[in-house]
């Protein structure tokens, strides 16, 4: 049993004064510390293991285990309530072994060439981590994608194991039909290649 009420941080722990919570190099955050944008990494997390025993772990050691537990519970529920057919369950957060239960979306990205390149690396990495289907938002989620970038991303996207074109509501539409014919034809060829 892996449900939210059984997994929670101990918010009364106030031991965030060590080198893990306050490293020498601090990335840019509004709060000027790592635990200000999340929970203290020294917090004790409590969870119920497969033998129904309450276990504890430090947040720094198993923070994403919560996401893994939710993926496992969702897969279990799905299989027990849908004639045991394997369904498509998409997650953004994960832990070692989560690919056994769900597929992975790489998260919100930007419409630029650097993010296109990074999506290839990330997709391969997550495949090595055991995810059978993984992919980014083709053409980028944030910012406006230009026709050349979107066309090239659609071509690369033909080879992602999880492929979708998706962007934020305030951004201009970036479906293949939104561009000039010269780009549409190339994108159409990419999609035909994917689904042949």
Tell what function each PLM region has.
Residues 1-196:
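Catalytic-domain carbohydrate-binding cleft regions of carbohydrate-active enzymes
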């Amino acid at each position: 049993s892996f449900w939210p009420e059984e997994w929670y941080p101990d918010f009364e722990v106030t031991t965030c004064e060590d080198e893990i919570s306050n490293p020498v190099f601090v990335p840019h955050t509004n709060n000027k510390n790592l635990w200000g944008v999340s929970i203290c990494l020294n917090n004790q997390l409590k969870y119920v293991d497969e033998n129904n025993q309450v276990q504890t772990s430090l947040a720094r050691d198993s923070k994403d285990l919560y996401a893994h537990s939710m993926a496992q519970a969702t897969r279990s529920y799905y299989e027990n309530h849908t004639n045991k057919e394997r369904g498509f369950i998409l997650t953004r957060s994960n832990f070692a072994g989560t690919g056994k239960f769900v597929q992975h979306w790489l998260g919100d990205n930007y419409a630029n060439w650097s993010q296109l390149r990074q999506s290839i690396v990330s997709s391969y990495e997550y495949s090595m981590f055991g995810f059978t289907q993984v992919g980014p938002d083709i053409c980028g989620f944030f910012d406006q994608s230009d026709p050349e970038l979107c066309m090239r991303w659609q071509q690369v996207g033909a080879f992602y194991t999880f492929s979708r074109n998706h962007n934020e509501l305030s951004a201009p539409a970036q479906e293949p039909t939104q561009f000039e014919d010269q780009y549409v034809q190339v994108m159409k060829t990419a999609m035909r290649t994917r689904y042949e």
